[in-house]
Regions:
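Soluble "head" domains of membrane/secretory-pathway proteins
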Residues: 1-13, 17, 28, 32-38, ...
Length: 189
């Protein structure tokens, strides 16, 4: 104990210990709580722009289910999954909006996304003020249990579930909740 006290009085040792503790805390925060990401493409314009830096809450979906409209950061290849959409590297992440929930049918008609209870029955049009035109018709596409249908807000410029199908919940990294850079765009959503 005496040796520890003497070492702590040394400013160099104190600095090293402080940096080590700070590094360990930052590592744990990124691993379990909040992780920063950079928006890789224009598929979420005008909500998120290319190069925006965002924070995603990693812990949130351990306590609650993803909700329609959430902006989610996820692995497009579902690291470890056998059904991998697209030909993406394991380190690649996508940022998209959750549109379709498990056991729903998703389609677009006349430029508007619709959620249906059956293949073409019980359909309702989503109110999507964030979506940029053009929106081509597609579907209906079934969202299996434990899966989510993801789309970019910039519908004419987005590689999303229309191209590679729904994602598994296990592919989710976290829900994006804040733009922290550039400073002029700091905002919560």
């Amino acid at each position: 104990m005496e040796l520890f006290r003497r070492l702590r009085k040394n400013p160099v040792v104190d600095l090293i210990l402080t940096l080590a503790v700070a590094g360990a805390i930052a590592y744990v925060v990124q691993l379990w709580i909040v992780k920063p990401f950079q928006v890789p493409s224009g598929s979420m314009e005008n909500t998120l722009l290319v190069g925006d830096r965002i924070l995603a809450a990693r812990f949130l979906y351990h306590f609650t289910d993803p909700a329609r409209g959430d902006i989610i950061v996820f692995h497009p290849n579902g690291t470890g999954d056998t059904a991998a959409p697209g030909n993406h590297e394991a380190s690649v992440v996508f940022v998209k909006r959750l549109i379709g929930l498990p056991n729903e049918w998703v389609r677009a008609r006349n430029g508007h996304v619709q959620i249906c209870k059956g293949r073409n029955t019980g359909c309702r049009t989503l109110n999507e003020p964030y979506a940029l035109p053009p929106q081509e018709d597609f579907g209906p596409t079934y969202v299996p249990p434990g899966h989510y249908f993801m789309m970019g807000d910039n519908r004419g410029n987005s590689d999303d579930s229309r191209d590679w199908g729904s994602i598994r919940r296990s592919q989710s990294i976290g829900r994006a909740f804040m733009i922290y850079w550039p400073i002029t765009r700091i905002s919560f959503f």
